[in-house]
């Protein structure tokens, strides 16, 4: 029996290993084709400030970009933003910026906004934004330095300077939200839509 009933593999407009692993583990065949867009430029030009709205816009833009180059294919775009109060964060450019972000987040609760958009032939068929709330434990400079030493390049590959599926889990006191949302791909609403479109066997 085949789970996926689509005419061809889904297209994932992302190079995120976490997102690719989530789709693979769920049995969804896909081709990973990252979108070549200027995320910061698009977000700035939009005038949007709400993290969830920015994530939704970027997920849509990624999917639309790849859809324009692959007509007829079902394209999944995804994006995730981090907000501490009203302030949004970007991926740290280097270790120093990662340390700065961790100092700001330590001992406080922040939100992760994960957005997805499904697009075919430039038309958005489905979109969703999910939120997870993350409470980082208090950290001193020595603990932050130790974490960054161990995390290496992974500290600059994710917003906030951490990957909660790895060593980043040691930074937290509390996590409230969907596991898939935290990893940047709200899988349950995605699967629900695919089922509604008769693209899954069950």
From Swiss-Prot:
Its EC number is 3.6.1.9. It is found in: Cytoplasm. It is an enzyme of class 3 (hydrolase). One of its GO terms (molecular function) is nucleoside triphosphate diphosphatase activity. Its cofactor is a divalent metal cation. GO terms for biological process: nucleotide metabolic process. Signal peptide: none annotated. HAMAP family: Maf. Nucleoside triphosphate pyrophosphatase. May have a dual role in cell division arrest and in preventing the incorporation of modified nucleotides into cellular nucleic acids. This is Nucleoside triphosphate pyrophosphatase. It comes from Rhodopseudomonas palustris (strain HaA2).
